[in-house]
Amino acid sequence: MSEWESYYKTEGEEEEEEEESPDTGGEYKYSGRDSLIFLVDASRAMFESQGEDELTPFDMSIQCIQSVYTSKIISSDRDLLAVVFYGTEKDKNSVNFKNIYVLQDLDNPGAKRVLELDQFKGQQGKKHFRDTVGHGSDYSLSEVLWVCANLFSDVQLKMSHKRIMLFTNEDDPHGRDSAKASRARTKASDLRDTGIFLDLMHLKKPGGFDVSVFYRDIITTAEDEDLGVHFEESSKLEDLLRKVRAKETKKRVLSRLKFKLGEDVVLMVGIYNLVQKANKPFPVRLYRETNEPVKTKTRTFNVNTGSLLLPSDTKRSLTYGTRQIVLEKEETEELKRFDEPGLILMGFKPTVMLKKQHYLRPSLFVYPEESLVSGSSTLFSALLTKCVEKKVIAVCRYTPRKNVSPYFVALVPQEEELDDQNIQVTPGGFQLVFLPYADDKRKVPFTEKVTANQEQIDKMKAIVQKLRFTYRSDSFENPVLQQHFRNLEALALDMMESEQVVDLTLPKVEAIKKRLGSLADEFKELVYPPGYNPEGKVAKRKQDDEGSTSKKPKVELSEEELKAHFRKGTLGKLTVPTLKDICKAHGLKSGPKKQELLDALIRHLEKN
């Protein structure tokens, strides 16, 4: 049966794209723009390194910010970024507060902004900062946060996330000035109430950085984070980059759904996408004259009168046999509606029953939403703990949205894991694994199995043991994508040529040969015949009768049977391979299609 389609094709294609796009290949889209302000302490202590070869805390901060800028240019160029220095000699801000310097207002990342940050790196950057901005000490953190709040309020665009990242190595910025400290805490609380998150990226200082002195009451802890867990101070650029990446990564919920455990037991959960295949960004159409992005708009017209059709004027149809059935849009939507959006618990199964071959697509992640239904976190945590203890999975029916077919899914419990920096490596919650239906399973045609003898098995075991290494999925990047992004980066920053990417997916041939030694040759001697050359040309098999011409195809039908089919008009019931063999046997020329074979054969039989 054909699919429901629009009575006017163009309208249907446009709506089909809109309806189906969220569920294709696990790609998910979000509304609104992320906005992020980098707030950097510019006091003298930030420009002092702990050792001769070590970077200064200010240098680490600038390099980290620059790294985020370049990645945003490639992946999220619509997001808004800003850089603000505080503790400066000169001031530059909209409210004329002292010792606060707004280097860059909230705007899209671009090449000029990255190059401007590049001027503050290294010894030359230190001198440039001293000449253009200078160092100060008499600042108020409440005024600094006020300036950041004004930067957010000056933006007229819709923002999905507002975040401030504070880089400093001073754990008690106001010392004994309790009035300034109190005002800073009050202002931080005001920002929290307006949906602005403040994250601390604290750097190493002599004697250690104590978060509890001042910043514990200042920084924002998200609902899904533990108040008692704080990052350790960063002494290396790699540690700081990891912290920034962990905080800067978008934590956007795909949907918020009801999770029904029974008739009267319901909690609210959020569905998150943790892993998604990286693809090249879609090309953007530009207007030739101004180089501005253009938007495509589709209009539907009546083919007879040429008048513009409104959405209410169009119908959807299905051709069933020779009859065209026309339905209203609401009726087709009703046909697609199986259930209300949500998760419904069907039962529990042992974890061992979930097999690797059940994999269909990347899993999603389920986490409680306490803000919508009070008590969801407690009930969710109890369910997670019991599933881990009993080693079971929850089998559920999952309906992501209206007008979407339900899926059967398995909720696999997952415990939280932290690394040595107290950064969350694995979140605690449920992995939502999509289960296959019966028609998703296929029979794979295997080649003939050749059994190896014990000596060959032992030799291969030794080879595998020599080539073992610890696998990390993030150690292997897609070389095509990485080179594409490097080329974009070179274009954006006006570089002469892009940096060449090392393809880490290629085998390290020299290292493999060094590890294996003579094992590879010994294995070849055990498996392959003497003198075997895998790179040599395969010798053609000799014909049974060298003097004869090519063999005639084997025809299973006799002449009488063929003529009987012709008289009854049942030649069309013969398969394409059979028709090809008959045509070859009679020396008939025809195309590869069945109708062409039939036409040639019928003409031949009519003549004879």
Curated annotation (Swiss-Prot):
The EC number of this protein is 3.6.4.-, 4.2.99.-
Compartments (UniProt record): Nucleus; Chromosome; Cytoplasm
Active-site residues (renumbered): 29 (schiff-base intermediate with dna)
Q: Kindly provide the PTM information from the record.
A: Phosphorylation by PRKDC may enhance helicase activity. Phosphorylation of Ser-49 does not affect DNA repair. ADP-ribosylated by PARP3.
Q: Where is this cross-link: Glycyl lysine isopeptide (Lys-Gly) (interchain with G-Cter in SUMO2)?
A: 315, 554
Q: Where is this region: Interaction with XRCC5?
A: 371-480
- Residues with the modification Phosphoserine, per the entry, are 2, 6, 49, 475, 518, 548, 558
**Residues found modified as N6,N6,N6-trimethyllysine:** 568
Pfam families annotated for this entry? Ku, Ku_C, Ku_N, SAP
The record's SUPFAM superfamilies line, in alphabetical order, gives: SAP domain, SPOC domain-like, vWA-like
Q: Where is the composition biased (Acidic residues)?
A: 12-22
Q: Which residues carry this modification: N-acetylserine?
A: 2
Spans annotated as DNA-binding: 275-339
Q: What happens when the gene is disrupted?
A: Viable. Reduced number of peripheral lymphocytes, however number of erythrocytes, platelets and neutrophils are normal. Translation levels in erythrocyte precursors are normal.
**What ranges does the record list as Basic and acidic residues composition bias?**
1-11, 537-557
Subunit structure, as described in the record: Heterodimer composed of XRCC5/Ku80 and XRCC6/Ku70. Component of the core long-range non-homologous end joining (NHEJ) complex (also named DNA-PK complex) composed of PRKDC, LIG4, XRCC4, XRCC6/Ku70, XRCC5/Ku86 and NHEJ1/XLF. Additional component of the NHEJ complex includes PAXX. Following autophosphorylation, PRKDC dissociates from DNA, leading to formation of the short-range NHEJ complex, composed of LIG4, XRCC4, XRCC6/Ku70, XRCC5/Ku86 and NHEJ1/XLF. The XRCC5-XRCC6 dimer also associates with NAA15, and this complex binds to the osteocalcin promoter and activates osteocalcin expression.
Output this protein's name. Answer: X-ray repair cross-complementing protein 6
The organism of origin for this protein? Mus musculus
What gene name is given for the protein in this entry? Xrcc6
